[in-house]
Amino acid sequence: MNMKLTVPFYLHKASAGFPSPATDYIEEDIDLNVHLIKNVPATFIIRVQGKSMNDIGIHDGDLLVVDKSLNPKNFSTVIANVHDELVVKSFVQEKDKKFLTSGSKKFEDRILINEEEDIFIWGVVTYVIHSVY
């Protein structure tokens, strides 16, 4: 993870409304590691398989940047270990109980986080990378 990965970065913003007469040149290069990875030793990338998180913008084949050093907040997207299988879920806390839920109405699961049953948070998703082409 020590390799520097740079890509061209345009300082001009892309308008989501009416077009702006922006210039067509690159201002600088950016290192994606600097922008996507805050804690290198605790960060990994995992590919999504399945459709249970579609409603929150995470799709089959997406890449997730995950930081194992972060503590999840209510409704954070997390990678969890559920009986030795890694899954992507939403973290939900209600009073003194913590649950994992799917981000799709088609999948109505609700898993109680219980380390005694080998269910625990592996890391917090910080970025989602998916193809739009």
Spans of model-derived segments:
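Short, positionally conserved secondary-structure boundary motifs
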Residues: 1-54, 85-86, 93, 97-98, ...
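Structural motif
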Residues: 61-62, 76
